[in-house]
């Protein structure tokens, strides 16, 4: 099985835990330190040893990390050592960073209407776009009287046109063909 495939559930679990406990930055630094420690040839030899018990490997690794790990970080290292997965820490860090990037990315959605939207309408549109795009959404509301009624939603190249002007233009195109 691929190291990335094995690493993904660990990275996802750590990421979800970090989000839930609002400790993403500290987990990022713990994983970064532990991953750098893996690049040490002596540590790498220790981690791949079949003679030393998993518990002893975890104890040594945690001792070397010192105060760089909190209680949750130490528990994570123990779980990784028990399952003989400490060599996967660089891959786990890589996936964790990808999840952080994806989570922090916010997509801008432009909403064009004839009149100002109410707070309730803004909340409904934001929620619908968040569900559809599976990302955080930032709404930019624009007032344009030329659309007559309805709204136009722009998400990058995608345009959802439910304006009266758009409908009239489509009707005109349909009638002229």
UniProtKB/Swiss-Prot annotation:
GO terms for cellular component: plasma membrane; proton-transporting ATP synthase complex. It is found in: Cell membrane. The keyword Magnesium does not apply. It is a peripheral membrane protein. Its main location: membrane. Keywords: ATP synthesis, Cell membrane, CF(1), Hydrogen ion transport, Ion transport, Membrane, Transport. Pfam families: OSCP. One of its GO terms (molecular function) is proton-transporting ATP synthase activity, rotational mechanism. F(1)F(0) ATP synthase produces ATP from ADP in the presence of a proton or sodium gradient. F-type ATPases consist of two structural domains, F(1) containing the extramembraneous catalytic core and F(0) containing the membrane proton channel, linked together by a central stalk and a peripheral stalk. During catalysis, ATP synthesis in the catalytic domain of F(1) is coupled via a rotary mechanism of the central stalk subunits to proton translocation. Belongs to the ATPase delta chain family. HAMAP family: ATP_synth_delta_bact (MF_01416). F-type ATPases have 2 components, F(1) - the catalytic core - and F(0) - the membrane proton channel. F(1) has five subunits: alpha(3), beta(3), gamma(1), delta(1), epsilon(1). F(0) has three main subunits: a(1), b(2) and c(10-14). The alpha and beta chains form an alternating ring which encloses part of the gamma chain. F(1) is attached to F(0) by a central stalk formed by the gamma and epsilon chains, while a peripheral stalk is formed by the delta and b chains. This is ATP synthase subunit delta. It comes from Baumannia cicadellinicola subsp. Homalodisca coagulata. The lineage of its organism: Bacteria, Pseudomonadati, Pseudomonadota, Gammaproteobacteria, Candidatus Palibaumannia. The gene is atpH.
């Amino acid at each position: 099985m691929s190291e990335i495939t094995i690493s993904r559930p660990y990275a996802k679990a750590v990421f979800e835990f970090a989000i839930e406990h609002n400790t993403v930055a500290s987990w990022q630094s713990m994983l970064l330190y532990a991953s750098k420690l893996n690049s040490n040839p002596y540590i790498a030899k220790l981690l791949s040893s079949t003679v030393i018990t998993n518990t002893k490997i975890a104890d040594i690794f945690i001792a070397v990390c010192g105060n760089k790990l909190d209680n949750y970080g130490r528990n994570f290292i123990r779980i990784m050592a028990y399952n003989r997965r400490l060599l996967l820490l660089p891959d786990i860090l890589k996936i964790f960073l990808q999840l952080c990037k994806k989570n922090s990315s916010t997509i801008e959605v432009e909403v064009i209407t004839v009149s100002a939207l109410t707070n309730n309408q803004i909340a409904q549109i934001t929620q619908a776009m968040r569900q559809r795009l599976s990302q955080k959404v930032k709404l930019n509301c624009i007032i344009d009287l030329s659309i007559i009624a309805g709204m136009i939603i722009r998400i990058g190249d995608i345009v959802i046109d439910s304006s009266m002007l758009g409908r009239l233009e489509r009707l005109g195109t349909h009638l002229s063909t």
